[in-house]
Amino acid sequence: MKFLRRSPVQTFLLVPLATIAWEWAVGTLHVELLYALVMLWGYLQYRRCGRYRTARGGGGPGLSGAPPERLVETGVYAWTRNPMYLGHIIYMIGVALTFQSLFAAAIALARTVWFHFRVRRDERGLTARFGEPYIAYTRRVKRWLPGLF
């Protein structure tokens, strides 16, 4: 069951299943299919950014992937330093909207906080690995949303 600890499994499988189970159990299961497009956006962002980063020597996908050989600063990484984690967050917001679920919104909020602290840890490792080039990158590109934070 080690695979259940992997962040993508938790986000893209366990969060929607837990939401469906919870909402069904309390009798409030409701689906707004249009919002599933937000889920699709988040999932595709995660997958495409992971492939882009890996193809450019930026390390393997996921938290347990191979360490980065080089700093990836192009493509979507020129706009946000964490597009894969952002894909997770967008997906979970999509789950909350699709199922009109406060339960899923609470999970999304908790996981967003977890990702934020995970990113801060990742940043310490990337600073140690790449030094000044990474520090310059952090000055140019926001952690989460372009132009905001």
Where do the language-model regions lie?
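Extended, alpha-helix-rich binding/interface surfaces that flank or overlap catalytic cores
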Residues: N82
